[in-house]
């Protein structure tokens, strides 16, 4: 059973209140993407890599894919399946109306540069003109603002999420850490193998969504939602 600690970023009741597993995101709905990648290893187990979507019209967050090492001895030799990540990004642009994509380029800068070259011109929202996707996570103030806005939207019930196990687990794993600019997120002190990468990906997708709204992108719903086969 998942529980939450005193320094948890979110509680189970707060997440449960916005859970909407039956929401269907259509091909025509403008969405934003957030990507947090990893190649590092923590105590012989690699961090996760996550790709999360956010519908611009209502802020609905949904898991596209989270790649994590399996439990047990096989985790020792596990590596992030780069081909699967590339395929998931490509499929997202084919299957959804992607208007913005913010990605943490750390250790994935070559991939992010390739995605910018392939899809950058199609985006309505850009982090910068030269690097439309590469979100500068070294800008602590921007990260703090991103998590503050996301948490407020969740706690106030302004958005929803798909209730997927990876997103739920990563959200509840996140712990608050005070810095000069505000609050950033970290792993639990007593469980450094716990993953929070999807929480960062969700923040990036939500930040892109806010920037899209600021530009008037995706504010009108179009079409009837339909499943993607």
Regions found by a protein language model. Give the residues of each.
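Beta-sheet entry/capping signal
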Residues: 29-32, 48-50, 59-63, 98-101, ...
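ATPase catalytic-site recognition across NTP-hydrolyzing enzymes
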Residues: 1-35
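Nucleic-acid-processing active sites and adjacent nucleic-acid-binding tracks
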Residues: 23-24, 42-45, 52-103
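Metal-dependent DNA phosphodiester-chemistry modules and their immediately adjacent helices/loops
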Residues: 63-64, 114-216
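A short acidic (Asp/Glu
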Residues: 43-49, 108-118, 147
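Acidic, metal-coordinating catalytic cores used for nucleic-acid/nucleotide bond scission
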Residues: 102-112, 139-140
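Acidic, low-complexity intrinsically disordered tails
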Residues: 215-229
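Long hydrophobic segments that form regular secondary structure
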Residues: 27-42, 55, 192-195, 202
